[in-house]
UniProtKB/Swiss-Prot annotation:
Ranges where the MPN domain occurs: 102-224
Annotated family: Belongs to the UPF0758 family.
Transmembrane segments annotated in the record for this chain: none
Signal sequence bounds: none
Taxonomic lineage: Bacteria, Pseudomonadati, Pseudomonadota, Gammaproteobacteria, Pseudomonadales
GO molecular function: metal ion binding; metallopeptidase activity
Residues annotated as binding Zn(2+): 173, 175, 186
Chain ranges for the short sequence motif JAMM motif as given in the UniProt record: 173-186
Stored InterPro entries: MPN, RadC_JAB, RuvA_2-like, UPF0758, UPF0758_CS, UPF0758_N
Keywords: Hydrolase, Metal-binding, Metalloprotease, Protease, Zinc
GO biological process, one term: proteolysis
Name by which UniProt lists this protein: UPF0758 protein PputW619_0186
Pfam families hit by this protein: RadC, UPF0758_N
Length: 226
Protein backbone atom coordinates (compact mmCIF):
# COMPACT_ATOMS: atom_id res chain seq x y z
CA UNK A 1 0.00 0.00 0.00
CA UNK A 2 1.24 3.48 -0.83
CA UNK A 3 1.95 5.82 2.08
CA UNK A 4 -0.53 8.29 0.59
CA UNK A 5 -3.26 5.69 1.17
CA UNK A 6 -2.47 5.36 4.89
CA UNK A 7 -4.54 7.22 7.51
CA UNK A 8 -3.03 10.70 7.83
CA UNK A 9 -2.12 10.22 11.51
CA UNK A 10 -0.02 7.15 10.64
CA UNK A 11 2.07 8.70 7.87
CA UNK A 12 5.56 9.44 9.22
CA UNK A 13 5.70 13.12 8.21
CA UNK A 14 2.20 13.90 9.46
CA UNK A 15 2.84 11.93 12.65
CA UNK A 16 6.02 13.94 13.24
CA UNK A 17 4.18 17.24 12.83
CA UNK A 18 1.22 16.24 15.00
CA UNK A 19 2.93 14.29 17.80
CA UNK A 20 6.56 15.39 17.68
CA UNK A 21 9.69 13.70 16.42
CA UNK A 22 10.00 11.59 19.57
CA UNK A 23 6.85 9.68 18.63
CA UNK A 24 8.46 8.16 15.53
CA UNK A 25 10.06 4.73 15.44
CA UNK A 26 13.53 4.27 13.95
CA UNK A 27 11.98 3.06 10.70
CA UNK A 28 9.66 6.07 10.55
CA UNK A 29 12.54 8.50 11.19
CA UNK A 30 14.54 6.86 8.43
CA UNK A 31 11.50 6.99 6.15
CA UNK A 32 11.21 10.76 6.66
CA UNK A 33 14.88 11.11 5.69
CA UNK A 34 14.56 8.85 2.63
CA UNK A 35 11.46 10.62 1.39
CA UNK A 36 10.33 7.97 -1.10
CA UNK A 37 10.37 4.24 -1.60
CA UNK A 38 11.37 2.08 -4.54
CA UNK A 39 9.37 0.00 -6.98
CA UNK A 40 7.25 -2.47 -5.02
CA UNK A 41 8.13 -1.07 -1.57
CA UNK A 42 6.82 2.06 0.08
CA UNK A 43 9.28 4.19 2.02
CA UNK A 44 8.48 2.68 5.43
CA UNK A 45 8.92 -0.85 4.09
CA UNK A 46 12.21 0.24 2.53
CA UNK A 47 13.35 1.78 5.82
CA UNK A 48 12.46 -1.35 7.80
CA UNK A 49 14.33 -3.53 5.34
CA UNK A 50 17.43 -1.34 5.56
CA UNK A 51 17.41 -1.44 9.36
CA UNK A 52 17.21 -5.23 9.28
CA UNK A 53 19.97 -5.44 6.66
CA UNK A 54 22.38 -3.20 8.58
CA UNK A 55 21.40 -4.41 12.04
CA UNK A 56 19.86 -1.21 13.36
CA UNK A 57 19.87 2.55 13.03
CA UNK A 58 23.30 3.09 14.57
CA UNK A 59 24.93 0.55 12.26
CA UNK A 60 23.25 2.16 9.25
CA UNK A 61 24.46 5.62 10.26
CA UNK A 62 28.00 4.32 10.76
CA UNK A 63 28.12 2.24 7.57
CA UNK A 64 30.98 2.98 5.21
CA UNK A 65 30.27 4.64 1.89
CA UNK A 66 30.53 1.51 -0.26
CA UNK A 67 28.11 -0.49 1.89
CA UNK A 68 25.66 2.39 2.02
CA UNK A 69 25.53 3.36 -1.64
CA UNK A 70 25.31 -0.28 -2.72
CA UNK A 71 21.85 -0.68 -1.22
CA UNK A 72 18.71 -0.23 -3.33
CA UNK A 73 17.02 3.02 -2.38
CA UNK A 74 20.17 4.68 -1.10
CA UNK A 75 23.07 5.86 -3.26
CA UNK A 76 25.75 8.58 -3.22
CA UNK A 77 23.34 11.53 -3.01
CA UNK A 78 21.59 10.18 0.07
CA UNK A 79 24.94 9.19 1.56
CA UNK A 80 26.12 12.78 1.19
CA UNK A 81 22.89 14.13 2.66
CA UNK A 82 23.15 11.79 5.63
CA UNK A 83 26.77 12.73 6.33
CA UNK A 84 25.82 16.41 6.22
CA UNK A 85 22.96 15.84 8.68
CA UNK A 86 25.23 13.91 11.04
CA UNK A 87 27.85 16.66 10.93
CA UNK A 88 25.18 19.30 11.63
CA UNK A 89 24.18 17.30 14.70
CA UNK A 90 27.77 16.96 15.91
CA UNK A 91 28.49 20.66 15.46
CA UNK A 92 25.29 21.60 17.24
CA UNK A 93 26.23 19.29 20.11
CA UNK A 94 29.72 20.80 20.31
CA UNK A 95 28.36 24.36 20.29
CA UNK A 96 25.74 23.54 22.93
CA UNK A 97 28.32 21.93 25.20
CA UNK A 98 30.71 24.87 24.91
CA UNK A 99 27.94 27.47 25.37
CA UNK A 100 26.08 25.80 28.22
CA UNK A 101 29.04 24.22 30.06
CA UNK A 102 27.01 21.04 30.19
CA UNK A 103 29.77 18.51 30.95
CA UNK A 104 29.02 18.09 34.62
CA UNK A 105 30.29 14.55 35.20
CA UNK A 106 32.83 12.04 33.83
CA UNK A 107 29.99 10.06 32.25
CA UNK A 108 28.74 13.18 30.44
CA UNK A 109 32.26 13.76 29.11
CA UNK A 110 32.45 10.19 27.83
CA UNK A 111 29.06 10.43 26.12
CA UNK A 112 30.06 13.69 24.46
CA UNK A 113 33.40 12.37 23.19
CA UNK A 114 31.77 9.17 21.95
CA UNK A 115 29.29 11.25 19.94
CA UNK A 116 32.16 13.24 18.45
CA UNK A 117 34.46 10.31 17.57
CA UNK A 118 32.59 7.06 17.04
CA UNK A 119 31.62 7.88 13.45
CA UNK A 120 35.24 8.29 12.34
CA UNK A 121 36.34 5.49 9.96
CA UNK A 122 40.04 5.88 10.85
CA UNK A 123 41.91 6.84 13.99
CA UNK A 124 41.68 10.45 15.11
CA UNK A 125 43.12 12.25 18.12
CA UNK A 126 41.40 15.19 19.77
CA UNK A 127 41.41 17.43 22.81
CA UNK A 128 38.64 18.87 24.94
CA UNK A 129 40.09 22.13 26.26
CA UNK A 130 38.92 23.29 29.70
CA UNK A 131 39.20 26.43 31.81
CA UNK A 132 40.45 26.62 35.40
CA UNK A 133 37.05 25.41 36.67
CA UNK A 134 37.08 22.53 34.18
CA UNK A 135 34.35 24.07 32.04
CA UNK A 136 34.64 23.32 28.32
CA UNK A 137 36.24 25.93 26.09
CA UNK A 138 36.50 24.03 22.81
CA UNK A 139 36.85 20.61 21.25
CA UNK A 140 39.23 19.99 18.36
CA UNK A 141 40.41 17.00 16.36
CA UNK A 142 44.14 17.61 15.96
CA UNK A 143 45.52 14.53 14.22
CA UNK A 144 44.24 11.87 11.83
CA UNK A 145 45.72 8.52 10.85
CA UNK A 146 47.51 5.90 12.90
CA UNK A 147 47.77 7.32 16.41
CA UNK A 148 51.13 6.57 18.01
CA UNK A 149 54.02 8.46 19.54
CA UNK A 150 55.46 9.31 16.15
CA UNK A 151 52.26 10.85 14.76
CA UNK A 152 51.32 13.08 17.73
CA UNK A 153 53.23 16.33 17.99
CA UNK A 154 53.23 17.66 21.58
CA UNK A 155 54.11 21.15 20.40
CA UNK A 156 50.83 21.32 18.44
CA UNK A 157 48.83 20.27 21.51
CA UNK A 158 50.74 22.89 23.53
CA UNK A 159 50.10 25.54 20.87
CA UNK A 160 46.35 24.87 20.75
CA UNK A 161 46.17 24.85 24.56
CA UNK A 162 47.79 28.29 24.68
CA UNK A 163 45.51 29.57 21.93
CA UNK A 164 42.43 28.55 23.93
CA UNK A 165 43.99 29.76 27.20
CA UNK A 166 43.22 26.32 28.62
CA UNK A 167 44.07 25.37 32.19
CA UNK A 168 43.37 21.68 31.65
CA UNK A 169 42.31 19.29 28.93
CA UNK A 170 41.05 15.81 28.25
CA UNK A 171 42.77 13.83 25.52
CA UNK A 172 40.77 11.44 23.39
CA UNK A 173 41.09 9.17 20.41
CA UNK A 174 39.12 6.37 18.83
CA UNK A 175 39.83 2.73 18.05
CA UNK A 176 37.90 1.87 14.85
CA UNK A 177 38.53 -1.81 15.61
CA UNK A 178 36.07 -1.46 18.49
CA UNK A 179 38.52 -2.57 21.21
CA UNK A 180 38.97 0.38 23.56
CA UNK A 181 41.85 -1.10 25.57
CA UNK A 182 44.90 1.22 25.40
CA UNK A 183 48.07 0.06 23.69
CA UNK A 184 51.53 0.69 25.11
CA UNK A 185 51.89 3.46 22.53
CA UNK A 186 48.70 5.04 23.88
CA UNK A 187 50.11 5.02 27.41
CA UNK A 188 53.56 6.32 26.45
CA UNK A 189 52.09 9.03 24.23
CA UNK A 190 49.78 10.18 27.03
CA UNK A 191 52.64 10.40 29.51
CA UNK A 192 54.75 12.36 27.02
CA UNK A 193 51.91 14.83 26.49
CA UNK A 194 51.40 15.18 30.25
CA UNK A 195 55.07 16.08 30.67
CA UNK A 196 55.01 18.60 27.84
CA UNK A 197 51.81 20.27 28.98
CA UNK A 198 53.01 20.44 32.59
CA UNK A 199 55.70 22.87 31.41
CA UNK A 200 52.96 25.41 30.62
CA UNK A 201 50.84 24.50 33.68
CA UNK A 202 48.12 22.71 31.72
CA UNK A 203 46.81 19.57 33.42
CA UNK A 204 45.83 16.42 31.55
CA UNK A 205 42.75 15.23 33.43
CA UNK A 206 42.15 12.04 31.45
CA UNK A 207 42.58 10.25 28.15
CA UNK A 208 39.34 8.76 26.81
CA UNK A 209 39.43 5.97 24.22
CA UNK A 210 36.29 5.48 22.14
CA UNK A 211 35.55 2.02 20.76
CA UNK A 212 32.43 -0.12 20.84
CA UNK A 213 30.37 0.16 23.98
CA UNK A 214 31.31 2.45 26.84
CA UNK A 215 34.37 4.68 26.24
CA UNK A 216 37.39 3.83 28.38
CA UNK A 217 38.89 6.28 30.87
CA UNK A 218 42.63 5.72 31.27
CA UNK A 219 42.47 7.43 34.68
CA UNK A 220 39.61 5.26 35.97
CA UNK A 221 41.38 2.14 34.69
CA UNK A 222 44.60 3.14 36.45
CA UNK A 223 46.73 3.57 33.33
CA UNK A 224 47.56 7.18 34.17
CA UNK A 225 47.18 9.55 37.13
CA UNK A 226 45.33 12.83 36.62
Amino acid sequence: MKISEWPAEERPREKLMQRGVGSLSDAELLAVFLGSGVRGRNVVELARGLLVKFGGLRQLLEADRDAFVGELGLGPVRYGQLQALLEIGRRNLATSIERDCALESPSAVRRYLKAMLRHEPSEVFGCLFLDSKHRPLAFEILFRGTIDRASIYPREVVRRSLMHNAAALILCHNHPSGNSEPSQDDVHMTLALKRGLALIDVRVLDHIIVGDGEPLSMVEQGWIVA
